[in-house]
Design a protein with these regions (language model features):
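N-terminal structural module
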Residues: 19-75
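Positively charged n-region of N-terminal signal peptides that target proteins for export
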Residues: 1-4
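Short strand-turn-strand beta-turns centered on an Asx-Gly dipeptide
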Residues: 150-152
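N-terminal signal peptide c-region/cleavage motif recognized by signal peptidases
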Residues: 13-15
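Flexible glycine-rich active-site/ligand-binding loops centered on an Asp-His dyad
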Residues: 155-181
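Short aromatic-centered micro-motifs
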Residues: 32, 147-148
Length: 209
């Protein structure tokens, strides 16, 4: 019995390395890689279309987890917003939804200043289809800028910090895609399967048939 107990205890660190969100395993920690230090999961949630259709699981990774949205946005440290697709969606639809959400969260001056980079980011998504289970991420590399990765391949980079700050507002800003989603990825007590607030469905992503 003592041996069995010791064996079970020895497995605990490994069992704690992933979190299950809608039966999808989300890593609690990302190991250091080229240009990114080790990152810890701050929070994760499922984004739904009209509160019913799951689109993706979003997971926010930080060097130092925090539930303070302003701190997440302003701190000049490595970050990753990772997405695991729950259904097939055209990348351009995701790009369009991002563009709409940015318009909601930025004032006219900010939007005008960032529009060239926003257009470049939209172009990086291309017209491919992201399939169920596909993983993509938007990374912030300190001193460099925003990096888009899709299917394990880097699609491009955009310099500076302002664009990534704006992108984070889509999920944790004053008008996020969902209040529940925001609370969950900030490590709050909201349910992991956070659904859209009805007033925010204008930023929803339509799935492919």
């Amino acid at each position: 019995m003592r041996l069995l107990t010791l064996c079970l205890l020895s497995l605990l660190p490994f069992l704690a390395q992933a979190r299950s969100i809608d039966q999808i395993e989300i890593a609690e920690r990302l190991g250091a890689e080229h240009e990114l230090p080790a990152l810890q999961l701050n929070g994760a949630a499922t984004r739904y279309f009209f509160g019913m259709v799951p689109v993706y699981i979003g997971a926010l990774y930080l060097e130092q987890p925090t539930n303070n949205s302003q701190q997440v946005i302003t701190q000049d440290s490595a970050k990753r917003m990772q997405f695991v697709m729950r259904r097939d969606v055209r990348a351009r639809k995701i790009a369009e939804a991002l563009g709409d959400a940015l318009s909601t969260n930025l004032d006219e001056s900010e939007l005008r200043q960032l529009q060239p980079q926003i257009d470049q980011l939209m172009a990086l998504y291309g017209n491919v289809t992201l399939h169920t289970g596909d993983i993509s991420s938007l990374d912030y590399l300190p001193g460099q800028g925003t990096r888009l990765i899709m299917g394990g391949q880097e699609k491009g980079r955009l310099p500076g910090k302002a664009l990534y700050d704006a992108l984070l507002k889509v999920w944790i800003g004053p008008s996020p895609v969902s209040r529940e989603f925001k609370a969950a990825i900030l490590g709050g007590a909201a349910p992991a399967s956070a659904r859209f607030d009805s007033a925010e469905n204008k930023n929803s992503v339509k799935a492919t048939n």
